[in-house]
Amino acid sequence: VSKQRVAQHATSKGGRGARQRILDAAAELFYREGINATGVERLAAESSVSKRTLYQHFSSKAAVVEEYLRSIEQRVANPAAAVGQTPRERLLAVFDTPTAGGAPLRGCPFHNAAVEAAGGMPGVQEIVRATKRNFADGLTELARQAGAARPRLLGNQLAVLYEGAAALATSLDDSSSWAQARTAAETLIDQAIASRK
């Protein structure tokens, strides 16, 4: 067997790329099926790696969950990082209806992780808390930029509204709660800006 064939086999099954395949499979499985419902065997199989290779990259399933959350954190953690819109538009964009493509709505991956990790994965819980705080801080910063009289209050109200919309959409598998939340957000934002004038 040539060295090239051995290298190709190592790359396709383990080796370089294995860590990313594990994280990609984790993102799909943890979100769609849940963290606790996804066993290490299934995660390894979906990643096309052995359990041994999985454990060479991650010390435990909790470590996989932590890295999965860190890998998606930047996409959702700070709404103030969005560009190309006014602060008010960026606040409202948080409430755009997510598209599930026919799949069941699963809500916020960080909320889901908090529920599934309760008491058993302190590292996961800390990542979730930090992400949720950063999210609320981002909303507060946008509220300040939009001219809200009390930006911290508005940021916290919008964070609670977001969590409620995500939870209700997930519970009912119905995205209409996002439109209702957006309408409520418009009212809150406009009142907060008007009260400053």
Labelled PLM ranges:
Residues V1-E33, A37-V49, A62-A63:
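Basic, helix-initiating cap at the start of DNA-binding domains
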Residues G15, L23, V65, L69, ...:
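Amphipathic, non-transmembrane alpha-helical scaffold segments
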Residues I22, A26, V40-L43, L54, ...:
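Hydrophobic packing within well-folded, soluble alpha/beta domains
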Residues Y31, E41, R52-S59, E67, ...:
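Base-recognition residues in the alpha-helical recognition helix of bacterial helix-turn-helix
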Residues E67, N78-R106, G155-L158:
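Hydrophobic alpha-helical connector segments
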Residues A81, E89-A93, M121-Q145, N156, ...:
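Amphipathic alpha-helical packing segments from all-alpha helical-bundle domains
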Residues G102-E126:
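Amphipathic alpha-helical segments used for helix-helix packing
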Residues R150-S171, Q180-L188:
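Hydrophobic alpha-helical segments that form the core
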